[in-house]
């Protein structure tokens, strides 16, 4: 595999972007798209062809889990970084919805809109990466959480990173520039894969430093390690064993099924870690629930955390 091209990856797993990038092999039968050796079969439901049906169930299950997580985060009124974490989970919901669109054929790979939806998916995935890093740094309390300045900074950072990834991906897919076309994918590979991997590595390192040097308990370290395990396992199953899984499952599922499931478990571990390192003033929360208070402000707001306490 040459650095920056998707030939080897797309021959193993049926990523959505594989339908809109070109093979560096000039003798390929297709001018656009790289067909994997094995991919999950489509299913016809109500005269509608649905791709990746197993992956669709994982996405729907993930949406239900995310709604439960958001409900629990919203109920933890006084926890550190509550608003910023909510923003992260909202991004994940948007990412799952975009994945449903491109994975299940809501926008068919042959349509003109498909490249735009794939670019949106990559942009949302990148925005989620930079968002979780922001939340990780927020735990060190370098700035006030939940403030207007903090939230607008988070929104601007995520939007800018989304735009960068979206534009690079779209220009690559559409071949609008001679330096970036469907066969010259190095820039997209570096930005979408390499830089985002570095961002996630920084997040993990920062949280390990936080647990080791700032917390009284090492139990949250278990949530971090489990999250890393699920994430790495998902990447390995998606990019290395997708073909074996597909053949073993008679084309009903492939590596994307397990990759998506592992990503959901990773998000659950991120929530669990945040839940373990933050505490809530129970008396304050219950009192406000009884009185129907939905928003707090001013200096009298109580916030609790196990960090630097």
Swiss-Prot record:
PANTHER family, A to Z: CHITIN SYNTHASE EXPORT CHAPERONE (PTHR35329:SF2)
UniProt keyword Transmembrane helix, yes or no: yes
Domain of life: Eukaryota
S-S bridge residues: none
Identification of the protein by name: Chitin synthase export chaperone
InterPro entries linked to this entry: Chs7 (IPR022057)
Subunit note: Interacts with CHS3.
Keywords carried by this UniProt record: Cell wall biogenesis/degradation, Endoplasmic reticulum, Membrane, Protein transport, Transmembrane, Transmembrane helix, Transport
Recorded topology in the membrane: Multi-pass membrane protein
Family indicated by similarity: Belongs to the CHS7 family.
GO cellular component annotations of the record: endoplasmic reticulum membrane
One GO term of the biological process aspect: protein transport
């Amino acid at each position: 595999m040459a650095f920056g091209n998707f030939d080897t990856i797309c021959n193993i797993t049926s990523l959505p972007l594989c339908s809109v990038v070109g093979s560096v092999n000039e003798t390929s039968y297709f001018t656009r798209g790289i067909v994997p050796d094995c991919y999950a079969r489509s299913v016809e439901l109500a005269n509608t062809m649905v791709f990746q049906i197993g992956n669709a169930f994982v996405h729907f299950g993930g949406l239900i889990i995310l709604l439960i997580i958001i409900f629990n985060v919203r109920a933890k009124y006084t926890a550190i970084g509550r608003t910023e974490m909510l923003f992260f989970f909202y991004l994940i919901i948007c990412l799952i919805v975009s994945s449903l669109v491109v994975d299940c054929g809501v926008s068919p790979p042959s349509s003109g809109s498909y490249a735009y939806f794939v670019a949106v998916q990559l942009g949302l995935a990148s925005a989620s990466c930079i968002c979780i890093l922001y939340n990780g740094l927020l735990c060190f309390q370098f700035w006030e959480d939940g403030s207007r300045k903090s939230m607008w900074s988070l929104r601007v950072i995520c939007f800018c990173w989304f735009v960068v990834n979206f534009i690079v991906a779209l220009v690559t897919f559409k071949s609008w520039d001679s330096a970036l076309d469907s066969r010259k994918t190095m820039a997209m590979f570096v930005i979408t894969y390499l830089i985002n991997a570095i961002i996630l590595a920084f997040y993990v390192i920062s949280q390990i430093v936080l647990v080791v040097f700032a917390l009284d308990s090492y139990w949250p370290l278990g949530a971090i390690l489990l999250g890393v395990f699920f994430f790495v396992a998902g990447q390995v199953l998606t990019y290395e064993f997708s073909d074996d899984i597909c053949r073993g499952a008679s084309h009903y599922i492939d590596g994307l099924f397990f990759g998506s499931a592992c990503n959901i478990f990773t998000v659950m571990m991120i929530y669990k870690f945040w839940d373990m390192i933050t505490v809530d003033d129970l008396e304050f929360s219950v009192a406000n629930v009884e009185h129907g208070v939905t928003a707090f402000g001013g200096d009298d707001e109580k916030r609790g955390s196990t960090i630097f306490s």
